[in-house]
Each structure stands twice: as structure tokens, then as C-alpha cells.
């Protein structure tokens, strides 16, 4: 059970209702969930978080497959159950190979058939492990993704790390029937 009350739209202030509607425009689920069910209590946090989320959900520069790879790596690192359950199928729909997803779940290095996935994996796992990136890893990432791609990849990883902290602190459970980490 979550540590924070899940509020219904009709119980929100006018500002929160407007924000709720804006958030729901880009999400397929019928009710506010995940970190936004926490952030809705603080519209000053929810508004910029929603704008940043849309950079990755609605108009990413990187291929959505790579965005979802980043998200799953961060979710696994944080054992963020809700985010994993929300992104497991999104990753498959974006074209991420199921064997890669299962390797991430098992905390094993996947076998990659695509260089861009291997490079993103190396960038993000190194960043998560050491909180910085070596010159060699940065150079490979810059050659493959470009400057803007690295900015997006690292910002996405940081955003989902923040989401993992919020989800875990407020014990937001996985989506009903969603895939879970063990």
C-alpha cells in the first residue's frame, strides 16, 4: 500500500485539476499513477516534471528503444517496481529485444545485436555505478549518439533515478498485473 493518499480528480484544486488533465493527455491509463500520483500534491514539482517526462515520452531525439533501455536500466538499479511494471511492455513495443530485457532483470550484461544499444548500456551502467563516465565511454557515446544524444541519455537516466527514489519512498506498488522485479 502506498504511503500517500491517491486523490481523485474531483477532490483536487482547480490548478491541480488542470495539471491532472495535462498529465493524462500523454498517458494511456485511466487514472493518475506512479510518481505523478505523488507529485500532484505539489503542482510546482509536477508541472516541470511533466514537461521533462514529455521530452522522453512524446518527443525524444533518441530512438524510443534506447529511451526504454535507459529507463529499464535505471528501474532495475533502483528496484523501482512501479516504473519497471509500467515500462516493461513499453520497452518491448519500442523494439527492445526480450532477451535484453530479461538480462537486465537478472542483472546480467545482455548480448547486443546493435551497437547503439551496447553503447547506451555502457554509458548508463557506468554512470549508475560510479556517478561519472570515463573519457573512453564518453567518446564512444559521443561518436554514436552525438552531443545532444548524450545530454538526453544522461538526463533521462537522472530523471528516472529521481522517479525511482520517489516511487520507493512512497511505496508506490507495481501496476496491477504488471511485470515485477524479484
Regions found by a protein language model. Give the residues of each.
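Hydrophobic alpha-helical segments
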Residues: 1-182
Amino acid at each position: 500500500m502506498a504511503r500517500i493518499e491517491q486523490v481523485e480528480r474531483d477532490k483536487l484544486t482547480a490548478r491541480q485539476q488542470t495539471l491532472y488533465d495535462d498529465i493524462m493527455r500523454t498517458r494511456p491509463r485511466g487514472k493518475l499513477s506512479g510518481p505523478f500520483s505523488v507529485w500532484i500534491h505539489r503542482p510546482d514539482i509536477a508541472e516541470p516534471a511533466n514537461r521533462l517526462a514529455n521530452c522522453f515520452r512524446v518527443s525524444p531525439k533518441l530512438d524510443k528503444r534506447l529511451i526504454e533501455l535507459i529507463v529499464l536500466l535505471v528501474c532495475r538499479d533502483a528496484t523501482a517496481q512501479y516504473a519497471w511494471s509500467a515500462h516493461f511492455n513499453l520497452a518491448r513495443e519500442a523494439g527492445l529485444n526480450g532477451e535484453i530485457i530479461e538480462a537486465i532483470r537478472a542483472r546480467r550484461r545482455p548480448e547486443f545485436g546493435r551497437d547503439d544499444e551496447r553503447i547506451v548500456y555502457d554509458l548508463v551502467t557506468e554512470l549508475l555505478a560510479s556517478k561519472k563516465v570515463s573519457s573512453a565511454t564518453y567518446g564512444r557515446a559521443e561518436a554514436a549518439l552525438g552531443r545532444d544524444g548524450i545530454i538526453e541519455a544522461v538526463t533521462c537516466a537522472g530523471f528516472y533515478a529521481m522517479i525511482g527514489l520517489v516511487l520507493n519512498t512512497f511505496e508506490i506498488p507495481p501496476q496491477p498485473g504488471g511485470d515485477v522485479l524479484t
